């Protein structure tokens, strides 16, 4: 169990999770997924220990896929307060292929989440939240990109986390706008290197790129993830790595959603004012749990929750 600390943000913290709600199609089977759900389903049991809540911000079609995702939100006790619905577009689908060595190749079809709209309820919750997470995928379409930028630029959240996800390559100008408004950034080794290439960084290694961009954009800290190798935190005090973490692997386990779980662990540790070491440990614990399970959003059992609470 991590060291006990008081919630430094205040009572009943509210966190927003923005982006692509999709149906993950894996080996011909459909299951609820998308980074906002994966992240929120992992964070919600932890926030509830503080009386807090996580709201998913996305857009669904009026179809079977939308029903599957609505049921998943309900199962994870995630309120649909900021969930948008449309009859003009179908719910997004992510075609996932798991390679022999465990890598996952994704193909994201156009979907309703490409049209997430800025609206008054979202503006109100952006002003009220203490934490915000969004990935880079919504930057692929003008509508969802515009809403995401508005969310980052108007939110009063003290933790505005940007999660790199380069299944498509955003324009440098868009990435720069998000980084200017973000406080924390997370990505894999490969994603940091790609980000450095897009932004023409002088550095060419992941940790050095994260350090360069942390300084350039006045970020509080950055997290570099490396699968089973664990996470490295980079901030003004330098680099902090953790110890290896593992859980018994389900026979049908796959790594889809593990990075989103790591982001949830990091967010919770930040909300609680945990030490640098505990931030890395929280990310490693939830990331390892997600990787040990056969679902994108498997939920967090009490035994795992209590390791962080």
Feature-to-residue mapping (PLM):
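Short, hydrophobic/glycine-enriched beta-strand segments
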Residues: 13-20, 161
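Conserved phosphate-binding/catalytic region of the ribokinase-like
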Residues: 1-16, 203-309
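Hydrophobic anchor at the start of a short beta-strand
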Residues: 53-54, 80, 158-160, 222
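Active-site metal-binding loops of divalent metal-dependent hydrolases
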Residues: 20-21, 137, 164, 261
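Structural alpha-helical scaffold elements that stabilize or flank donor/cofactor-binding regions
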Residues: 124-125, 177-178, 215
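Short catalytic helix/loop segments, enriched in acidic residues and glycine
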Residues: 30-46
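Conserved beta-alpha-beta core of the PfkB/ribokinase-like small-molecule kinase fold
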Residues: 131, 135-208, 229-230
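Conserved N-terminal subdomain of the carbohydrate kinase-like
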Residues: 12, 23-25, 48-136, 306-309
């Amino acid at each position: 169990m991590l060291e006990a600390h008081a919630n430094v943000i205040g009572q009943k913290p509210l966190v927003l999770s923005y982006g692509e709600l999709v149906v993950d199609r894996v080996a011909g089977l459909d299951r609820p997924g998308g980074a906002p759900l994966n992240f929120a389903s992992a964070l919600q049991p932890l926030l509830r220990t503080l009386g807090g809540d996580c709201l998913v911000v996305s857009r669904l079609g009026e179809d079977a896929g939308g029903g599957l995702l609505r049921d998943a939100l309900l199962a994870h006790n995630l309120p649909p307060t900021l969930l948008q619905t449309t009859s003009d577009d179908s719910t997004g689908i992510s075609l996932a292929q798991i390679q022999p060595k465990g890598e996952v190749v994704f193909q994201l079809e156009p979907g309703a989440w490409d049209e997430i709209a800025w609206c008054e309820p979202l503006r109100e919750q952006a002003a009220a939240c203490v934490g915000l997470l969004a990935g880079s995928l919504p930057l692929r379409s003008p509508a969802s990109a515009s809403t995401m930028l508005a969310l980052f630029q108007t939110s009063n959240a003290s933790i505005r986390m940007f999660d790199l996800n380069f299944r498509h390559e955003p324009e440098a100008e868009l990435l720069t706008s998000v980084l200017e408004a973000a406080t924390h950034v997370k990505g894999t080794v490969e994603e940091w290197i790609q980000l450095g290439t897009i932004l023409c960084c002088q550095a060419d290694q992941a940790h050095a790129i994260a350090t360069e961009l942390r300084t350039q954009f006045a970020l509080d800290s950055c997290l570099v993830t490396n699968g089973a190798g664990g996470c490295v935190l980079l901030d003004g005090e330098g680099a902090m790595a953790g110890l290896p973490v593992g859980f018994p692997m389900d026979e049908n386990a796959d790594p889809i959603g593990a990075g989103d779980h790591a982001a949830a662990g990091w967010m919770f540790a930040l909300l609680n004012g945990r030490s640098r070491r505990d931030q890395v440990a929280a990310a490693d614990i939830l990331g390892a749990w997600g990787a040990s399970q056969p679902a994108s959003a498997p939920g967090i059992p009490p035994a795992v929750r209590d390791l962080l609470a």
